[in-house]
Every structure is written in structure tokens, then in C-alpha cells.
Amino acid sequence: MPIPGTPSRAELAEHLVRTRIAGDVATPRENNLSHYRKLANGDRGFWLGLELGDRWSDEQDVLAVMAERVGVNDDPEHRYGQDTIDPELTISALERMAGRLRKAADGGQRVLFATGHPGGLLDVHRATAAALRDAGCEIVVIPEGLTTEEGYVQQFADVSVLEHGASLWHTHSGEPMKAILTGLEREGRPLPDLVVADHGWAGYAAQHGVDSVGYADCNDPALFLAESEGTLQVAVPLDDHVVSPRYYDPMTAYLLTEAGLK
């Protein structure tokens, strides 16, 4: 569903709903609530590299933040069926992210890109990295030989990913980002000025003091909680794996145009 050039805000909102990146998304309400409950109950697999302590032990508090920042249904009695992402919140978050990208470009900053959802978001990150490089940023090259229990931490098209069994791997873990930051310190190299990522890659970096922005789905509340607390600079709500990765192209074009990078 291509949109020639860069869409207007209204055109992008329509596109996000039509492709189910936002609007009535594929993730069912019961899955969202299950994840909110598991985070509140201290399941660290849902903390996405962050340290939440006991601050979010009430799942109703988690739901309230998700309603405010993502646009899910705020009714705690709505337990099953359709849930939503507000496209206007997605676009507003993209505009906030664009501001941070502009700052990176103006300062010629060192930027690290990473994704735990390569099937959906790899090219979003690749295109953003290319635009920042053209604007004078240094795109951080990760150390070689990094591993986690899940696989190898590699870099393709300027984007760090996890490789497992000769395949790019879906992961929400913060461990790959831990491996990168630890590896940089071990080599005596400075940490990035900015991390642009998603899921645990963004969460771990933000938790450890690196300016970070990222993408997350409506069933991954941790990044939105971190944004609400000021740990993460921007969390963009979206369905992170729709039918075609090309559906994200208009969103990427809008982001880069807003940042003055296109």
C-alpha cells in the first residue's frame, strides 16, 4: 500500500489504520491484559531490559499508562476481543522521535541501531541509519564475537540483530544490548550518544543511562512505562509485525521528513 512521497499527517493516520499498524490491531485484548499482568507480577521477561522494581505491581496502573500513551481501551472490564492503538498517538510519538533524531544530526552524534523484530522493523531502522549517516552522524559498529544464550549478536545494514541458526531472531531480551555496551566498554570505546531500537534493546540501553528511543507494540508495556518515568526518551506505539514490512515505508518517510533528514 505505497503512498507516493511523504504522507501528510492525515494521510499517514489513514494508512496506519488501513494496514493495521494502528487502529484495530491484530493483538487481542486478552493478550494485552495477560502481558500487563505478567509485568505487574514481576515476570522479568516482560520488563524489556528495564528495572521496574515494585513501582508497577498494580496491573490497573499499567493499563492506565497504556490507555494514555498507546490508546488501548481504558475499560478494565473489557477483557476479550478487539483492542486498539490510537494512530494520533503513534504519529505524535514519531514527531517526538524526529526531534531527537534532529538533535543527533545537528550534533554529529554516535548512534546505535538495533531491532528484536527484524521481520517487521529492520528496514525502518536501516533507512533511519542511512539518513543519519548522510547527515553526518557516526553509526556505531558493534564489536565482533558477541553472544548471548539465545545466539550471536550481529550487525546487518547498520542494524544490530540477534542471529540464531543462520536466521535473524525475534527477541525481546535486553541481553544483546548488554553484550554490545559491555563489549564497547571492554574495547575502550565510548558508548553511543543515542540508541534507536525496540523492545529489550531499547529498554536495556535506556536503563543504563544511554539516550534511547524505540518502538513497541500494545502488548509490550515496559517501554511506555519507562517513557512515563523519563527513563526512555520516546516510545512509539505500533503493531511491530504486520503483513508486509513495506507497510512501514510511509511511516519511515514521515519520520525522516519531520526530522529534516529527507
From Swiss-Prot:
GO terms for molecular function: phosphatase activity. The keyword S-adenosyl-L-methionine does not apply. The keyword Isomerase does not apply. InterPro entries: Phosphatase_SCO2771. Disruption phenotype: Disruption of this gene does not cause histidine auxotrophy. It comes from the Bacteria. Keywords: Hydrolase. Its EC number is 3.1.3.-. Displays phosphatase activity against p-nitrophenyl phosphate (pNPP) in vitro; however, the physiological substrate is unknown. This is Phosphatase SCO2771. It comes from Streptomyces coelicolor (strain ATCC BAA-471 / A3(2) / M145).
